[in-house]
From Swiss-Prot:
This is Outer membrane transporter CdiB. It comes from the Bacteria. Residues 76-151 form the POTRA domain. GO terms for biological process: monoatomic ion transport; protein secretion by the type V secretion system. It is found in: Cell outer membrane. The gene is cdiB.
Amino acid sequence: MFVSSRKTGLIVCFSLIGYTASAFSASLNPAERNETQQRQSEVIEQSRQQREALQQLNNIVQAPLKADNALQGPCFTLREIRFNHSTLLGQRDQTALTAGYLNRCNNLEQINQLMHDVSNWYIQRGYITSRAFLSEQDLSGGVLQLEILEGRLEKITINNQTERMTRTAFPAREGEILNLRDIEQGMEQMNRMPSQQVTIEILPGSQPGYSVVNLTREAHLPFTGGVTFDNSGQKSTGEQQLNGSLALDNLFGVADQWFISAGHSSRFATSHDAESLQAGFSMPYGYWNLGYSYSQSRYRNTFISRDFPWHSTGDSDTHRLSLSRVVFRNGTMKTAIVGMLSQRTGNNYLNGTLLPSSSRKLSSVSLGVNHSQKLWGGLATFNPTYNRGVRWLGAETDTDKSADEPRAEFNKWTLSASYYYPLTDSITYLGSLYGQYSARALYGSEQMTLGGESSVRGFREQYTSGNRGAYWRNELNWQAWQLPVLGNVTFMAAVDGGHLYNHKQDDSTAASLWGGAVGVTVASRWLSQQVTVGWPISYPAWLQPDTVVVGYRVGLSF
């Protein structure tokens, strides 16, 4: 059938108007919507990993010194206290430790207390194989000689064998003073790989003052993977999704981890379809971590306007390079600095014709802090981040843009935080907060959304997006019982809420959403099954959400 160019233009115009109107609450294209959901899911997963790592920290408790009347004896006035063979005790620390003992008469019990205080100074800072002791000496001259043994690392072994990966996973080096925090960091780097789970023992070395750190590792295959089936997709591109993932551990023997995952609409339809691919690696070096990831997303949707079929398609490719450094850790907290460079290219087409207004390349850099801490009997995370759009790598710029156009060279601040608290042995509370702020309008791929399994539960197809806002997630989990073969049965109840604030160029983005959900998960080592039922509680009238949202997920792991 022949259609004139003028008529074609009118059809396109009316079709786009109709398509936009039908998606009033969903201003993002399917690729952007998928990316924002993935980003929100990554925030949840990152907080979970931070809390798990926090549980592995060892808080060293100072042991009280038991009084021994047999040590009292005569007292000696001490004019000077020397710390022999100490490289870590600075002058200020020495002054603080000896302040209560100088120029006063001390008996052997008090001198023993001083040795205990000095040893605990080392232990509290993670130097668990260092200690102070006395050698035979004459105290009548008023000078006390404290001998300091700063225990050193002889070697790190795995199952009593030396392996190359310990050199990249552990910041500790042979011959250096042994610090528990360096060992914990290395264990954390190892345990991030499922096939390299280890336990630790510290053994005497072959020479005095030296120790061997031996890691015990059970035999596992060097890869893990899984397949999942769920209904997390969008109606326009297919609700039922089939996903597969594979992770390879220690491929090059340097504690490196490689992963790849792919997803596809389970119906593999020609008119409505979505597919995704993610791949990347992470590589540690002591307190540093280098990571790279690539993600690809494709969608296809067919809609009818004026009895004419229109094919809406799109694709996006995202590269992310990250570098992080743990700058502080002790027995109760850990803090890391994280930097990232990202590039995203997105293209959208209508009947095979590129739509320049919604196709672009954006680059950005970010700098953030990842902090986790044991707090009030629970586990807390706090991660602020600054994001800046840049012109690098051929990205779009803001040259000659009007004031109300979205910014490619944007400034954006985000904050994610969480708090996990065990109410009983089987009931836990988890609260999560996420916020975003930008003074100027953002493109859809940089906006935040409200509504969905990873933001405000109780909504799925209907959501709202904007440049600034926040949401708060609350859930109670009850691990009820364990079934043979099927595994643990856990019940969940959640109430979430969020708000997007007005932007002066886009008043329609203002909205408050509240939703609730209940669910049950049955999970074992190999099989997991989950069903959730959600419902909207409060929302703007124009959103018109579904009355009830049912989600399900079945997964197999190996």
